[in-house]
A protein has these predicted regions:
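Secretory targeting and sorting signals
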Residues: 1-27
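Short amphipathic alpha-helices and their capping/turn segments at secondary-structure boundaries
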Residues: 27-44, 103-122, 173-188, 288-291
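Serine-esterase "nucleophile elbow" of acetyl-processing enzymes
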Residues: 29-92, 111, 140-146
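Structural recognition of the beta-strand scaffold that forms the well-ordered cores
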Residues: 42-45, 51, 86-90, 119-124, ...
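Oxyanion-hole/transition-state-stabilizing segment in secreted/luminal serine hydrolases
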Residues: 54, 104-165
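Charged, often glycine-rich, active-site loop that binds/positions anionic groups
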Residues: 94-111, 253-267
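Conserved N-terminal glycine/acidic-rich loop preference
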Residues: 120-123, 146-181, 190, 194-240
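Catalytic His-Asp segment of secreted/periplasmic serine-dependent ester chemistry enzymes
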Residues: 195-293
Length: 293
C-alpha cells in the first residue's frame, strides 16, 4: 500500500514536471519568435514640409495636425522598406532652429528624438530658413503679372536669396548635421536635397505663376541651396542625396502623371509647390540607393 502511494506521488510529480516543462517550452518557443518580428533598428526622420509630406494624404494617425506628417513621406517609406522602428518628428514649417526649440504647442525640438540607439537619420531641411522658400515663391508669384516675359522677381529680390543661403543656411545645416552626429554617433545620416520646383526654361502660367525670366532665377536659388546642403554634408560625413538630376522634368509644370511637385493651380492638392506621393516615392528610392552604396 505504501509502495503504491509512493508510485502515485512520483507519477504526480512527473506529470507536474512535464506540464511545467511544457509551459516553459511553449513560452521559450513563442516569445522569441514574436520578439524577432519586431524591427530592431531605429530610424529618426527630421525636417520641414518637404520631409513631412505636407499635403499628401493619408496623414499619420495621432501626429500633430499642424506638422502635416504624411504616412507616405520618404522617411515613412524608407522605414517600411527596411523594417526600421521609426520616430517621425518632421514638421511643416520647420527651420533648422526647430531642431533645438519647440515649433508649435505640443511639438518639441526635433533633435530630442535623436538618441544614442538611433541607427539611421533621414532629413530634408534648410529651405525655410531666412524665409527663403516662402519669400522666393511668394514674391515671384506676386510680381509675375507686372512683367510675364521678364524677370520682375529677380529685379526685386536681387542677391538676397543667395546671400541668405551662403551666410545663414549653409552654416546652420552644417551645425545641425554635426549635432545629430554627436547625439547618434553610430547612425548613418542621410540628408536629401530639394527636387526642382520649376522647369529649365519657360514657365507654365497659370499653373505656375512665375514670369518666364524668373524661371532661371528660381532654379539658380534652388541650385545654390542644394549645393550648400551638399557642402554641409561633405563637411560632417553625412550622406547627401542629390535630387537635381532625378527630378529634372518632374517639376510643377510637368504633366499630371509625370510631375513630382504640385503646381499652384489646377491641382486638388491641399499644399502646392510641394512634392506629391510620386515625389515622396522618388525621394525614398534615392535614399534607398544611398543606403545600399
Amino acid at each position: 500500500m505504501r509502495d503504491r502511494s509512493k508510485r502515485s506521488l512520483v507519477a504526480a510529480v512527473v506529470v507536474i514536471l512535464v506540464v511545467a516543462a511544457g509551459v516553459v517550452w511553449w513560452r521559450a518557443d513563442r516569445e522569441p519568435s514574436h520578439t524577432a518580428q519586431e524591427p530592431q533598428r531605429h530610424q529618426v526622420h527630421l525636417g520641414d514640409s518637404f520631409a513631412s509630406g505636407a499635403g499628401t494624404e493619408p496623414l499619420v494617425d495621432g501626429a500633430q495636425f499642424t506638422c502635416q506628417q504624411s504616412s507616405v513621406n520618404f522617411g515613412q517609406l524608407v522605414a517600411a522598406r527596411h523594417d526600421y522602428r521609426l520616430t517621425d518628428v518632421s514638421c511643416a514649417g520647420a527651420w533648422t532652429k526647430s531642431l533645438y526649440e519647440g515649433q508649435y504647442e505640443g511639438v518639441g525640438p526635433q533633435l530630442d528624438a535623436v538618441t544614442p540607439d538611433t541607427d539611421l537619420v533621414t532629413l530634408m531641411l534648410g529651405g525655410n530658413d531666412a524665409t527663403l522658400y516662402s519669400t522666393l515663391i511668394g514674391v515671384c508669384a506676386r510680381v509675375e503679372p507686372s512683367d510675364q516675359k521678364g524677370a520682375p522677381c529677380r529685379a526685386e529680390l536681387g542677391r538676397a536669396p543667395t546671400r541668405a543661403v551662403d551666410d545663414a543656411i549653409e552654416p546652420a545645416v552644417e551645425q545641425a548635421l554635426r549635432d545629430i552626429a554627436v547625439r547618434a554617433p553610430r547612425a548613418r545620416i542621410v540628408v536629401a536635397g530639394y527636387p526642382w520646383l520649376v522647369p529649365r526654361e519657360q514657365s507654365c502660367r497659370p499653373s505656375v505663376r512665375i514670369a518666364d525670366g524668373d524661371i532661371a532665377f528660381v532654379r539658380g536659388v534652388q541650385a545654390r541651396l542644394n549645393s550648400a546642403i551638399e557642402k554641409a554634408a561633405d563637411a560632417t560625413g553625412a550622406r547627401f542625396v542629390d535630387m537635381a538630376q532625378r527630378s529634372d522634368g518632374h517639376d510643377a509644370c510637368a504633366a499630371d502623371d509625370v510631375r513630382w511637385i504640385e503646381p499652384m493651380t489646377g491641382t486638388t492638392a491641399r499644399v502646392t509647390m510641394h512634392p506629391n506621393e510620386a515625389g515622396q516615392r522618388a525621394l525614398a528610392d534615392a535614399v534607398d540607393e544611398a543606403l545600399g552604396s
